[in-house]
């Protein structure tokens, strides 16, 4: 998918030197498959596909640490009960038929070319933004929030001035605190 390629390449370029291993989300790879992630090892990018339970995440982290210590780029699918090499062909077919890639703004990362998806022209009648002429909303990030730096591995959640004070799971300031899958939320809940 162009969306995955665009975002993956941009993030990889921005993270050069600051991320040793990517932890790929299982729900995305369940659709896209693992081919792109596997091919990135040829460019020196290591990664592991993980599930979402504590056991699945810990397994992915343990595999990452072990393989990283071997000193060679690697890819491992630690979520094989859901993620396959080819992904979901039917989901891919539907995405290709109905959607096209577009530039998209990522909180804390800025605009990443071809990292979003929108309905193709022939399906715009189902796009509420087009149908009801809803203007683009511009989000304003709290300048004290370091979510972008957390996402890029430049700091820990606890390094952020608003973490645990203004920004909590009940009152999130940045995307990293919004869901229980976010790095800041996990730090907050488990004291990592």
Regions found by a protein language model. Name each.
Residues 11, 32, 36, 43, ...:
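General structural feature for long, well-ordered alpha-helical segments within catalytic domains
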Residues 71-72, 190-192:
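Short, structured secondary-structure boundary patches
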Residues 135-191:
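Cysteine-cluster motifs in flexible loop/terminal segments that predominantly coordinate metals
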Residues 1-6, 11:
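Single conserved hydrophobic/aromatic residue that forms the stacking wall/gate
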Residues 8, 35-36, 130, 146:
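Glycine-rich, charged/polar anion/phosphate-binding loops
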Residues 59-149:
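Internal helical hairpin/lid segments
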Residues 18-83:
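A conserved active-site cap/scaffold subdomain adjacent to cofactor or substrate pockets
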């Amino acid at each position: 998918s162009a969306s995955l390629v665009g975002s993956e390449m941009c993030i990889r370029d921005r993270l050069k030197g600051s991320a040793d291993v990517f932890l790929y989300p299982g729900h995305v790879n369940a659709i896209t498959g693992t081919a792109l992630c596997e091919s990135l090892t040829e460019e020196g990018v290591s990664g592991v596909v993980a599930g979402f339970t504590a056991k699945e995440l810990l397994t992915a982290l343990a595999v990452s640490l072990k393989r990283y210590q071997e000193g060679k780029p690697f890819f491992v699918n630690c979520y094989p009960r859901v993620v396959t090499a080819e992904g979901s062909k039917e989901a891919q077919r539907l995405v290709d038929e109905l959607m096209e890639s577009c530039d998209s703004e990522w909180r804390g990362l800025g605009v990443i070319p071809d990292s979003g998806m929108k309905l193709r022209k022939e399906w715009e009648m189902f796009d509420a933004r087009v149908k009801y002429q809803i203007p683009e909303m511009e989000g304003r990030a709290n300048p004290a929030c370091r979510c972008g730096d957390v996402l890029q591995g430049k700091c820990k959640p606890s390094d952020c001035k608003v973490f645990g004070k203004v920004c909590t799971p009940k009152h999130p300031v940045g995307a990293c605190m919004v869901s229980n899958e976010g790095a800041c939320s996990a730090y907050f809940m488990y004291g990592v």
